[in-house]
């Protein structure tokens, strides 16, 4: 389905520079777009690609359009440009692109008919809204509540007493254990597990060394998981239930694939967590934080609002102040890394040599005096 720029602006705002009747039927990168496609410029370092793109129209920020016009003597198509170009001018082209992309997906995806697949297992004591879509081999246990417009894809498991908020979509093989609350419009991707037991074991050992006897005693995890509205949880991510109170994921948190969130954590609203990050139990992360991929955060620490942890960093203490924090060693040439590692191994010896030199110099200074 093709839409004019005028129709897009009526839906999403912005201003048109060029032909308002230009039609686009999809999106593509600047260097690959054709005349029927909409591209976007989110990073000014790619401004030169706007000059050569074949896109029918480009989403662009006002300041970047000014730079472009300055580079092309104010003309809509300068000497280096592929042809006349149309623009939708908006303060945030990237977010505008995301909304248009979702619109095209929605237009191209026929709505699924509500109902329960014959192979699904729904406990008689569960409540399932008539507008919900329940796919093949889904299990919904007693006391669970499936609200309006929820989609549960194949093999989804919903435990007893759990609530899935209106408009949520759970992809195949996602599992939400008992006693959890999923807010409205959640997206939970394939293989995610919400509400599995937290990692809690009490040591019960006596003796030392080879004479040590006893075992680890499992601590029942009687809390649940509360997920706020508009949260997205990536594939194969696990969020443990609380030991006594709930683990809490606040509104509009976005969690990537294969992230581990331990029991009793609280993740503040609008925080984003990239893939393979691990957050140990009883940690609190503030609002609008950004956690890089494969970062590790120790248990019982607090991160303040607007904290950014870069990829592969390890956090072992609380960071209450907003800012960017790094502890990862960046990739360097292999030989250079080996030389640096050798220096690190010898730091103790180097320190002792420096101390000895300082002592000798001090003694020499005393003799000269």
Swiss-Prot record:
Its EC number is 2.3.1.191. The keyword Repeat applies. CDD domains: LbH_LpxD (cd03352). It holds the Pfam family LpxD. The active site is at 263 (proton acceptor). Pathway: Bacterial outer membrane biogenesis; LPS lipid A biosynthesis. NCBIfam families: lipid_A_lpxD, PRK00892.1. It catalyses: a UDP-3-O-[(3R)-3-hydroxyacyl]-alpha-D-glucosamine + a (3R)-hydroxyacyl-[ACP] = a UDP-2-N,3-O-bis[(3R)-3-hydroxyacyl]-alpha-D-glucosamine + holo-[ACP] + H(+). Keywords: Acyltransferase, Lipid A biosynthesis, Lipid biosynthesis, Lipid metabolism, Repeat, Transferase. One of its GO terms (biological process) is lipid A biosynthetic process. GO terms for molecular function: N-acyltransferase activity. This is UDP-3-O-acylglucosamine N-acyltransferase. GO terms for cellular component: membrane. Homotrimer.
């Amino acid at each position: 389905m093709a839409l004019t720029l005028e129709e897009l602006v009526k839906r999403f705002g912005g201003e048109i520079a060029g032909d308002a009747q230009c039609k686009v039927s999809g999106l593509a990168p600047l260097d690959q777009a054709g005349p029927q496609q909409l591209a976007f410029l989110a990073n000014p370092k790619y401004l030169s690609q706007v000059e050569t793109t074949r896109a029918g129209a480009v989403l662009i920020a006002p300041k970047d359009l000014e730079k472009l016009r300055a580079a092309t003597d104010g003309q809509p198509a300068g000497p280096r440009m592929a042809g006349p170009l149309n623009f939708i001018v908006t303060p945030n082209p990237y977010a505008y692109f995301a909304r248009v992309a979702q619109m095209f997906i929605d237009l191209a995806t026929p709505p699924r008919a509500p109902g329960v697949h014959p192979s699904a297992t729904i406990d008689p004591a569960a409540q399932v809204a008539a507008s919900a879509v329940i796919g093949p081999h889904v299990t919904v246990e007693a006391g669970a509540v499936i609200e309006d417009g929820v989609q549960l894809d194949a093999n989804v498991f919903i435990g007893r007493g759990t609530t899935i908020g209106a408009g949520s979509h759970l992809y195949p093989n996602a599992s939400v254990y008992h006693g959890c609350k999923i807010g409205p419009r959640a997206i939970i991707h394939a293989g995610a597990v919400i509400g599995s037991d937290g990692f809690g074991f009490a040591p019960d050992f006596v003796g030392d060394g080879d004479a040590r006897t006893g075992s680890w005693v499992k601590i029942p995890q009687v809390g649940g998981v509360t997920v706020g509205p508009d949260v997205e949880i990536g594939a194969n991510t696990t969020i443990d239930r609380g030991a006594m109170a709930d683990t809490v994921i606040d509104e509009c948190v976005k969690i990537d694939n294969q992230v581990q969130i331990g029991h009793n954590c609280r993740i503040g609203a609008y925080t984003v967590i990239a893939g393979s990050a691990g957050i140990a139990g009883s940690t609190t992360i503030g609002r609008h934080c950004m956690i890089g991929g494969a970062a590790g955060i120790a248990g019982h620490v607090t991160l303040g609002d607007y904290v950014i942890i870069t990829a592969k960093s390890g956090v072992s203490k609380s960071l209450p102040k907003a800012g960017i924090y790094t502890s990862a060693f960046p990739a360097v040439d292999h030989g250079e890394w080996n030389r640096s590692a050798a220096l690190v191994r010898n730091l103790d010896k180097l320190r002792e040599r420096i101390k000895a030199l300082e002592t000798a110099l001090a003694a020499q200074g005393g003799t000269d005096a």
